[in-house]
């Protein structure tokens, strides 16, 4: 990722601090990633919090929304492909923000950086909400007679345990945590499949074919789940044979879409209208696999804080006066990071509505990063070599991204406000 401090440079960000962050995002820092390794990296970047809400999204949008999931999978595969074409047109582009600069100059890079940081912030809020919800479910006896406050206290304790990780400057020592998404996905998928086969769960509730009024918010959840495009240019440049990048995208997105579809259908079929916005919270509490899934979902946010915060921390440190010593910068970075995480904790406890926040993030940020900007970059960089159909299609994708972003953000925000008013009696 690029830092905002380098936005004013007429080149990609090649600062010394950049290498560790890229290594955290992609394990292949050199141009030596095989096809299989690249697929694993891309799948790992795509799979995340979104998988928890797949059954909920189907319940909200109806069974027909599965086709929307598949359509977005195809669309975001295409936008991944055209990011590769943008890099081939300008080989100096090494990152998503470099492509933004190649297309729209300094303003393009600045816009990209702002969206990167906004996505990081909102993702951290979502992770913390997930931590709170699942840690409450992991200790049901503890909170059954004491209301919401004890759960909030334990969430605060969990965040406090993770706070010291924000003070680590060299994150390469914990880069193995970046593979946690794939492990969590395997555990959750295994738990859902086990419950479907052996759990004896039967739900008589009916899910409608289509709920058109919920499509904007459901679209946000689906798009959030396909939004890994920020690191795809780095993955492209790390490949031994970049000409296979499109095939990597097709295999990776097909794998993830199949996983999401299986989770969505299985979870929605088992729990029907009673399904929670996080599938782990709907699994039978007495099953051992449920406890494993809950703890996997609890531990994942705690391991993500340092990794997700790294780009923000780097920018904060670079913004400090050069006269400061390294020790003073480390302390300032740690204090600012801790303060930001406490703000995120407060926000997550104030607005603990995972599904709505995830939908808002997808509509406000992910659709821009995964659909609107890639098509806009492609139009600007490769306009001369496009057919009329390709130009029209990508112009349509830009418009579609803007429409989905506006409608989804409005609907998600409206639902959030409505829920807050209902809960707090305003």
From Swiss-Prot:
It is a multi-pass membrane protein. Keywords: Amino-acid transport, Membrane, Transmembrane, Transmembrane helix, Transport. GO terms for cellular component: organelle membrane. Pfam families: Aa_trans. The chain crosses the membrane at residues 34-54, 55-75, 110-130, 148-168, 182-202, 215-235, 248-268, 292-312, 340-360, 363-383, 392-412. One of its GO terms (biological process) is amino acid transport. It is found in: Membrane. Belongs to the amino acid/polyamine transporter 2 family. Amino acid/auxin permease (AAAP) (TC 2.A.18.5) subfamily. This is Amino acid transporter AVT1H. It comes from Arabidopsis thaliana.
């Amino acid at each position: 990722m690029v830092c905002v401090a380098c936005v004013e440079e007429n080149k990609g960000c090649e600062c010394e601090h950049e290498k560790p962050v890229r290594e955290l995002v992609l394990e292949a820092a050199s141009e030596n990633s095989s096809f299989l390794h690249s697929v694993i990296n891309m799948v790992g970047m795509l799979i995340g919090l979104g998988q928890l809400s797949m059954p909920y999204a189907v319940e909200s949008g109806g069974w027909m929304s599965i086709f929307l999931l598949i359509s977005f999978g195809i669309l975001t595969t295409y936008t991944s492909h055209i990011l590769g074409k943008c890099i081939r047109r300008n080989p100096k582009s090494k990152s998503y923000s470099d492509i933004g600069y190649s297309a729209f100059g300094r303003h393009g890079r600045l816009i990209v950086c702002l969206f990167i940081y906004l996505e990081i912030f909102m993702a951290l809020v979502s992770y913390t909400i997930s931590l709170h919800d699942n840690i409450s479910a992991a200790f049901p006896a503890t909170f059954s007679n004491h209301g919401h406050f004890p759960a909030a206290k334990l969430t605060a304790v969990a965040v406090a345990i993770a706070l010291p990780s924000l003070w680590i400057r060299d994150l390469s020592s914990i880069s193995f945590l970046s593979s946690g998404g794939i492990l969590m996905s395997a555990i959750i998928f295994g738990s859902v499949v086990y419950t479907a086969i052996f759990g004896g769960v039967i739900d008589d509730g009916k899910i409608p074919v289509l709920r058109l009024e919920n499509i904007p918010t459901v679209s946000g959840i689906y798009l959030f789940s396909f939004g890994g495009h920020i690191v795809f240019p780095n993955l492209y440049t790390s490949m031994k044979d970049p000409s296979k990048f499109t095939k990597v995208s097709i295999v990776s997105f097909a794998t993830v879409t199949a996983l999401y579809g299986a989770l969505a259908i299985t979870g929605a079929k088992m729990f029907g209208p009673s399904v929670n916005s996080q599938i782990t919270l709907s699994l039978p509490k007495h099953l051992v696999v449920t406890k494993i899934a809950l703890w996997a979902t609890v531990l994942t946010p705690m391991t993500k804080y340092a990794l997700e915060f790294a780009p923000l921390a780097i920018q904060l440190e670079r913004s400090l006066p050069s006269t400061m010593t390294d020790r003073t910068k480390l302390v300032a970075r740690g204090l600012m990071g801790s303060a930001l995480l406490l703000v995120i904790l407060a926000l997550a406890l104030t607005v603990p509505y995972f599904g709505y926040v995830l939908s808002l993030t997808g509509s406000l940020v992910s659709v821009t990063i995964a659909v609107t900007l890639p098509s806009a970059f492609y139009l600007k960089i490769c306009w001369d070599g496009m057919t009329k159909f390709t130009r029209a299609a990508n112009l349509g994708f830009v418009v579609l991204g803007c429409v989905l972003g506006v409608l989804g953000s409005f609907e998600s925000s409206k639902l959030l406000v409505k829920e807050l008013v209902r809960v707090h009696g305003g």
